[in-house]
Curated annotation (Swiss-Prot):
The gene is ppx. One of its GO terms (molecular function) is exopolyphosphatase activity. Keywords: Cell membrane, Hydrolase, Magnesium, Membrane. This is Putative exopolyphosphatase. It is found in: Cell membrane. Belongs to the GppA/Ppx family. Degradation of inorganic polyphosphates (polyP). Releases orthophosphate processively from the ends of the polyP chain. It holds the Pfam family Ppx-GppA. Its cofactor is Mg(2+). It is a peripheral membrane protein. Signal peptide: none annotated. It comes from the Bacteria.
Amino acid sequence: MNDSILEPKHRGNVREIAAIDLGSNSFHMIVARIVNGSIQVLSRLKQKVKLAEGLDENAVLNQEAITRGVNCLALFAERLQGFPMENVNVVGTYTLRRAVNNDEFLRQAAKVFPYPINIISGQTEAKTIYAGVCHTQPEKGRKLVIDIGGGSTEMIIGDDFTPLMAESRHMGCVSFATQFFTDGIISPENFQRARQSAVNKIEDLGLEYRKLGWQSVLGSSGTIKTVAQVIATNLDPNGTITAERLNALIEQTLQAKHFTELNINGLNQDRVDVFVPGLAILSAVFDVFHIQQMRYSDGALREGVIYSLEKNFQVADIRASTA
């Protein structure tokens, strides 16, 4: 990343803003420039922190995970030198919501990171994800948006830019890895237990969501991105996820006995340890909501946070003007 582009410039109507998403698997930062109401993404930075891995059964976040998170924030702070407070929006998600000692994380973070951290509710997270997807995708009309994160999964139905239903449930690829795939061991039984647990967490939403209906289904964040990449590499250049392709991928995945044995074209090494639990959650989502096909959206929570900092930008420009 070129640090020089991060100097806040206020010539004319130019403003630079930053959005940071403290996720349960990775921390993400986007820096964007607002020019006369239009947004241009200048840079993106992602660090795998695996915060959720440090959450024990009593919802206490261990010091190792806190240290990983704080070290990442120190790096982000270097990149943001000179940014005024009002131009930076930082949100904490599932793991920081859940941790009973999140005040300790915030205390240690404040020593290296000068910007306030807002720990947001699951519903706020869901609505912000929806805004991020809507402002980066061309689909019009009613859509279902699914976001599988490290610690939680968000499900939102909306018309154009207005969310109608937004829910967040405690199931994510990092937390499920710890819960159902101890030491990275894969078995059909482990997979089915994870999948059934996900079904149990969302089946109360199925009927209500299906009654509302939708014209298109969009998925965001790492699990769905990875599944789309694997499908694009092996089955369909467009990376469209269908129920049939998902089942074929599950069948292939279950031939491995351990995360380290996953040898799937298109699967990046940094996703190997969360791919199978993410797949179990996605399979449950497809079943409960009777999804026929889903397309990956590269807009998600951090894009929604950028949008919340600058509500007046022209919607088309986040697609057209990405640097």
